[in-house]
Amino acid sequence: MNEFKSVFKNELTEYLAISQGTISDGTLQNTRRILLSFDSLLAEENAGGISEKTVNRWIGGLLQTNAPKTVSDKVSYLRKFLRYLQYEGYSVFMPDCPKTSDSYVPYIFSDGEIQMLLASADSWVGRHTDPQTRQMDMEFCMLLRMLLGCGFRLGEPLAAKVKDINFSRGTILIRHAKNNKQRIVPMDVTLTGMLEKYCIAMAIKTEPESHLFPSVRKKGAAATKGTFGLRFRKLLQETNLYVPGKAHSRGQCLHCFRHYFAIHSFAQAEKKGRPVNDSVPFLSVYLGHHDMDETEKYLKFSSDMFPEYTELFEDYAASVFMEVGDEEK
């Protein structure tokens, strides 16, 4: 049964079939979800084609419930399908991607707040007696330290398996990073030791195919982002650190730990006298960034908190972009 209902239902189905295998499963699911939304509007209007009016109505609906950046991303998905239709000989309206400015400023936890969060999370392990809950408590405590100690994206350690850890070298292989990249991430000796004890306590150290953070409900699967996201919200509320987020903003979340890591790594390198033009590129590679623009986003912080580091990074970025501009002339 075709899940699409509009006059373009066959083309939509064919487009997804062609896309399968050329993009990740997550991207394919996002594409399907977005195209289903557009297809519903086409079916509702009983449209025989794709006009400017219909496309703008769909975009207008997105703007009411999504952040500008999200709208731009969804329009980009639609544009790819519309290009496919044009290739097939259809005359369709092609919208521009709405221009957005990156206004996202992450919540930066203070050192004191981080210590408070860790202490509270650690107390959960001794508080609960249910085996599954205790397992999740242990996983949560370890995950927090890995995010803080290595600046991982949340999905990276969740996808990792025991075989990806080299305890003697203190490294972890991230096989499935953003943009289908891989990288080997060095860990601090203290974190490596803690991770080894965790694996022994979880009885997974001798199980190379075991996920580092196994699901308590589904055997052989990894714990989900949502599971830890809910636990983090509970932790924030318990420590009275919860701050309601603004509409369409990420707010306080585990991804903020990645920003915390980036900022403090940059600050630590500067305090040790390491030149900025050495530390920033290294940090960019360590975080698995595609370019310096990505790293710049992770060094967004309040100038009131770190005025000296703000100026240092801005000076470095300006010199880099000036050199690039000179080369292009």
Residue ranges of model-derived segments:
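Conserved catalytic core of the tyrosine transesterase superfamily
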Residues: 1-329
